[in-house]
Amino acid sequence: MIDAKLVKELRDRTGAGMMDCKKALEEANGDMEQAIEILRKKGIAKAAKKASRETGDGIIAAYVHFNKRIGVLVELNCETDFVARTEDFQELGNKIAMHIAAMSPRWVRREDVPQEVIEKEKEIYRDQLKDSGKPEHVIEKIVEGKLNKFFEENCLYEQKFAFDEDKTVEELIKESIAKIGENIRVSRFVKYTVGE
């Protein structure tokens, strides 16, 4: 088990996301320098440094399923119109739109989930465990784990990428940031399904 202080320190040093830092530290058996190297090799540290840059350009990527019953629009932003016109960027938009069609996320990031939804989920999880006889601190750990699973299932950035489950959508985007050299982000999306 990796200490949360180590994860925070790695995040402060690289700007990478918490889950990326935790995975890198686990892979490096807690070695900070090796974890930084792992993040650099994956392009995540580089991507994190670009994350604060403004993304005022981009595209609306569209995907319509072959049966014409599911359609997705996704706003994918970057820093310049030059990048927005590249084949790599447009392909990324198409991949993300197809992923949304397949996996039906509800929000882009966990920060986008309304607090009342989070509280309701926690309440449901606590109710499921109230008669378990487990101590309160154990129940809270279980609730936290279930909540993380909820985010992984419902937040686009935390979902396993539908076409390569070895990475999340966020990791796919960070790889593109490292390759393209500009900050990239999904601003919003909408999925339409006939009859819903």
Curated annotation (Swiss-Prot):
Pfam families attached to this UniProt entry: EF_TS
Localization (cell): Cytoplasm
Region (Involved in Mg(2+) ion dislocation from EF-Tu): 80-83
Protein name, as recorded: Elongation factor Ts
Recorded name of the encoding gene: tsf
UniProt record similarity statement: Belongs to the EF-Ts family.
GO MF, one example: translation elongation factor activity
Functional note: Associates with the EF-Tu.GDP complex and induces the exchange of GDP to GTP. It remains bound to the aminoacyl-tRNA.EF-Tu.GTP complex up to the GTP hydrolysis stage on the ribosome.
Principal location class: cytoplasm
UniProt-listed HAMAP family: EF_Ts
Species in which this protein is naturally found: Thermosipho africanus (strain TCF52B)
Record's GO cellular component terms: cytoplasm
CDD domains named in the record: UBA_EF-Ts
Keywords (A to Z) from UniProt: Cytoplasm, Elongation factor, Protein biosynthesis
Protein biosynthesis listed as a keyword: yes
